[in-house]
Amino acid sequence: AYNQRKDRWSISYLRKAEKERIARGEIEVTGKDENGALILQFSKTVGRMKNPVTVWNQRSHNAGAGGSNVLRALIPGRAFAFPKSVYAVLDTIRFAVANKPHALIIDFFAGSGTTLHAVNLLNAEDGGHRRCIMVTNNEVSAEETKSLSAQGFQPGDDEWEKLGIARYVTWPRTVCAIEGHDVNGHPLKGNYLSGDPEHPRAMAEGFK
């Protein structure tokens, strides 16, 4: 390669990492120069990879704005302590599967279902077909346990199970996010904070 500033030629060899990026389509071979050296450029259709920084300071990553507020819109009146921001999870998984449109993501601690919600958002942004498997039990909160026990209910009773995290939070949140309405059947209001800021995705649009 010729360095015009230093008026110097040098020989550069493709390392294994660069060859792998060419194979993945991240770097394109656009031709050869007069000396037979390959001409490379970063793909315009595949996002350029970069290492994540240690600290993220974005309002959308706040557990209140991107976590509690989103969950409250989907399942109003149903409490869940400290839900993660769907946008923080979205940006986290983007680093791992941005160039894997058919990836399968497994969340062994599904909680309120934020990971699946984030996967749907990423698919909506780039047209991917990623899938997500969520694993959770159906335990009730400590407060609900005391209340239900005092009423004579126990695990396995319908009154107990319907207040468990899977049936009361995770599953309803997932259905509502996909269908674009809250648990009461009302269309969701507002837009998602991710994606194209000029053409934001309406929450009521869901993920069909």
What are the residue ranges of the model-derived segments?
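Residue-level detector of functional hotspots within protein domains
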Residues: 40-42, 160, 193-195
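Short mixed-charge
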Residues: 178-205
